[in-house]
Amino acid sequence: MAHKKGTGSTRNGRDSNAQRLGVKRYGGEVVRAGNILVRQRGTKFHPGNNVGRGNDDTLFATIDGVVTFERYGKDRKRISVYPVAAAAS
């Protein structure tokens, strides 16, 4: 067994914190205005009706309502929030 660590092992041992990205509110969930819907890098999901986009591409609800995931175009997804009364009918 070596009594010295060796140069490689002493230089390792670093890791960055997780960014906690992903969908935070799923389709059919009732949300309040300002709730974060998705944290993402780039626009995997695009903002739809009543959804805003932050500087870091985070999508958030601008009104109280129900979350819906929609497809549009050939290969794009968008997230919209519709008022609860409209979603019930």
UniProtKB/Swiss-Prot annotation:
InterPro entries: Ribosomal_bL27 (IPR001684), Ribosomal_bL27_CS (IPR018261). Residues 1-22 are annotated as: Disordered. One of its GO terms (molecular function) is structural constituent of ribosome. GO terms for biological process: translation. The keyword Transit peptide does not apply. The keyword Ribonucleoprotein applies. SUPFAM superfamilies: Ribosomal L27 protein-like (SSF110324). Residues 7-19 have a biased composition (Polar residues). Disulfide bonds: none annotated. Keywords: Ribonucleoprotein, Ribosomal protein. One of its GO terms (cellular component) is cytosolic large ribosomal subunit. Belongs to the bacterial ribosomal protein bL27 family. This is Large ribosomal subunit protein bL27. It comes from Cyanothece sp. (strain PCC 7425 / ATCC 29141).
